[in-house]
Amino acid sequence: MDKQFSFQGQYDFKTVSTGLYDSWSSASFFKPQKNKVPFTAILPPPNLTGTLHIGHAFEVSITDQIMRFKRLRGYGVNWIPGFDHAGIATQTKYEKLARETNPEYFQAPRKQKVKMIMDWALTQGDTIQSQIKSLGASLNWNQVNFTLSKKASQIVNDSFIQLFEQGFIYQAETLVNWDTKLNTAISNIEVINKPVDQQLYYIAYKLANNPKKRLVVATTRPETIFVDVCLFVHPKDKHYHSFVKQKVVNPLTGALMPVFTDSYVDKKFGTGVLKCTPAHDFNDFALNEKYRLPFVSCIDHNGLLNEHAKQFTGLTVSAARQQVVEFLQTQKLLVKTMPLTSNVGFSERSDTVVEPLLSKQWFVDLPKLKKALAIKKYPELIPKRFNKQVTRWLSQLKPWCISRQLIWGHPIPVWTHKQSGALHVGSTAPTDKQNYTQSTDVLDTWFSSSLWPLICLDWHKNKHFVPTDLLVTGYDILFFWVLRMTFNSYFQTKQLPFKQVLIHGLVRDAQNRKMSKSLNNGINPMDLIRDYGADATRLFLTSNHTPGDDLIFNEQKLKSAANFLNKLWNVTKYVLQLGEQAKTVPSTHLPSTLSERWIWAKLKQLIVQTTKLLDKYQLALANQALVNFIWNDFCNTFIETIKQEDTALLPQLYTTAKTVLSTAVVMLSTVTPFLAERIYQQFHSGSVMQASWPTAKAVKPPKLFADVVEAVSSLRHYKANNQLVANQNLAVVLSGKAAPVVQNYFHFNWVDLRIEVNKTPGFQIKIVDNAANNLAHLEKQRSFYLAEVQRSQAITTNPAFLKKAPPHKVKAELLKLEEYQKKLAEVNHLIAKLTKAE
């Protein structure tokens, strides 16, 4: 019992949380106890590029609630943290800072550059770790990992070497996403598509044997015509049957090009004629592989046109486009131009237009690896609907480019013989290393990240790999991370890396937009913790989403979470004061009151309900049940009845109140650990983290008191929904056989109560005050809500609205309809129940 902490004054989350995290950590509460059934999870490693963002806070809050629940349930929880070196993201972030603070970096040798980035990155890790702790995350900080540590390097090298030796890693020249500013290949996830206003150029390709005839091609990229290899038309497009297998003249080079047919061609786009430029377009590259055509590039890795562009050599892509169009115009080969808005890929890190370019890179042959592994059962995905998406991805796997032209990352363990070109692949250099050149490329960050479970569980030391129990992660990296972890872990261990994957969505702004720098709509979770506290932030984040769905940020709901914690603080103060009052009353053994039996039954129902929900990771529903119990059942009902009970009952009522409160607080500690700890320590020695999850069998609350609760609620609704004269009380008749037993529960300062005992079972209430006027008021309300329900139903069943309106507007209208229907039902209930005897 913590006698030093006082519940005097108003709720102050800063005072509540001060010192608690350090005390938990010092007591080793976050370390797994070896004598318990293990439950292991790994934290998706945040990038060392800055500070914690709202998505991290969302994920950490979800996972920590589950980890705390499992601890209370008796598991030896080991939640393992760590950080991702985040190759391109970290290097570009540091180099941007270095331009202002450390210009010496750009003249430094490679090894020194890596050290400079490492020193900076590790300080970022300290900041992120501090921020995660401020959320109350119960991570095992004695086991922190890093994807660029010596341990990780050994595992990464071993994995690369084994995959290479077994034929799953190879080197090839092929088309990749190329960042011309950073001069490196990048992954699909690092390409951001943005709508761009462009011009669609209609260009004539003359028939070789009849220059008067021509095929017109619509393209946004006339600067790549130099390396066109052929034209395609759709086989069912009758307009072009006579052109098939003929040759046309390249309008910029004069080279002859064949005309082929392929059903890939979109007959409705442009003229229905497609120019094939396999060195600069992924779709064209796929066609090229199908038809085995020659291909060559006219754009170099710096984004400049090369020698194949003739007089346009050395120009940037944008400058070349303009000059090529002018040249075609002079040759009377430009038929027309039309405006077009279409998506263009930009590099997430440099904001440069991404160029599909030919480059010699290293690849993991994922289709071949998948076939060889023959995994029969993948980790269980929650929700199950993501299984379809994963199945589709598995059927469409392509080789994975794993090399990057950066300095920050795991060096590719490959040396090339200077004369023969023979490769040496190993964790150490060849004995005659003077005859070899070491690769200057590094591995894609996702390659080391795909080995994260092995890194976290020290697989290089202990080959007995124990799969983790749960991974909590976002749907946006399900393919890029989760599937690749599954492949790499299974390749090394013949076991899945995790048993279950709980999938969450993104955090979107109040307008349902994805957060981005361009929109400047990002939310800093540290600001939320500063303004509302970690408990309120966690409660909001975990209570307003369902697995797999996005969370729409709503500050009003965050304020509601803070209001609940204030209510919890105040009721704790009241219970503590009740304890002081109870000391002045002689202790006697009296039967439990009706309200006590009711609150015990409600508590048992809550225990059963929340246990089932948290076992299924239905955090939002569990939290809503907890909040509803504490706010309505405990505070608004049970505590209010205490004020009306005989003072002789105070000792037992206090015992019931503190026991129910502290039991509920144990469950609540999973989501609001700071305030829960302070409350728990008022009634118990030790920490709430040493408590056990309560167990119970569900029982039905006493019907008589349940009827009382419903009747009181109806009276309150009636009072709130009717325009009563100032200082006028409700005249209420309480009748029935049980009227004397329950009358205390109706003694409010706004009720004039008259008791009429009769032989009718139970009790009945009847309002006799100004019934006609109040009924008229209720009828008016009913008409209003009925009209709104009908209006909203008309909108939400209108096919045009459902087809054209944005999803968030449809959802908002459906929520409106639900609220109006609820209000209408309440008014109907009052009209039916409160104007006549039950």
Curated annotation (Swiss-Prot):
Q: Which reaction does it catalyse?
A: tRNA(Val) + L-valine + ATP = L-valyl-tRNA(Val) + AMP + diphosphate
Per the record, the domain of life is Bacteria
Name a GO CC annotation attached to this entry: cytosol
Question: Which residues does ATP bind?
Answer: K517
SUPFAM superfamilies, per this entry?
Answer: Anticodon-binding domain of a subclass of class I aminoacyl-tRNA synthetases, Nucleotidylyl transferase, tRNA-binding arm, ValRS/IleRS/LeuRS editing domain
Its predominant location is: cytoplasm
Q: What is its EC number?
A: 6.1.1.9
Does this entry carry the keyword RNA-binding? no
Coiled coil (UniProt feature):
768-838
In its UniProt record, a GO molecular function of this protein is:
ATP binding
Where is the motif ('HIGH' region)? 46-56
Tell me which Gene Ontology terms the entry assigns under biological process: valyl-tRNA aminoacylation
Q: Where is this motif: 'KMSKS' region?
A: 514-518
**Enzyme class (EC, first level):** ligase
Subcellular location per the Swiss-Prot or TrEMBL entry: Cytoplasm
Q: Which UniProt keywords apply?
A: Aminoacyl-tRNA synthetase, ATP-binding, Coiled coil, Cytoplasm, Ligase, Nucleotide-binding, Protein biosynthesis
Q: Read off the PANTHER family from this record.
A: VALINE--TRNA LIGASE, CHLOROPLASTIC_MITOCHONDRIAL 2, VALYL-TRNA SYNTHETASES
Query: What is stated as this protein's family in its record?
Result: Belongs to the class-I aminoacyl-tRNA synthetase family. ValS type 1 subfamily.
Q: What is the annotated quaternary arrangement, including any partners? A: Monomer.
Q: What does the entry's free-text domain comment contain?
A: ValRS has two distinct active sites: one for aminoacylation and one for editing. The misactivated threonine is translocated from the active site to the editing site. The C-terminal coiled-coil domain is crucial for aminoacylation activity.
Q: What does this protein do?
A: Catalyzes the attachment of valine to tRNA(Val). As ValRS can inadvertently accommodate and process structurally similar amino acids such as threonine, to avoid such errors, it has a 'posttransfer' editing activity that hydrolyzes mischarged Thr-tRNA(Val) in a tRNA-dependent manner.
Q: Which NCBIfam families match?
A: PRK05729.1 (NF004349), valS (TIGR00422)
Return the protein name.
Valine--tRNA ligase
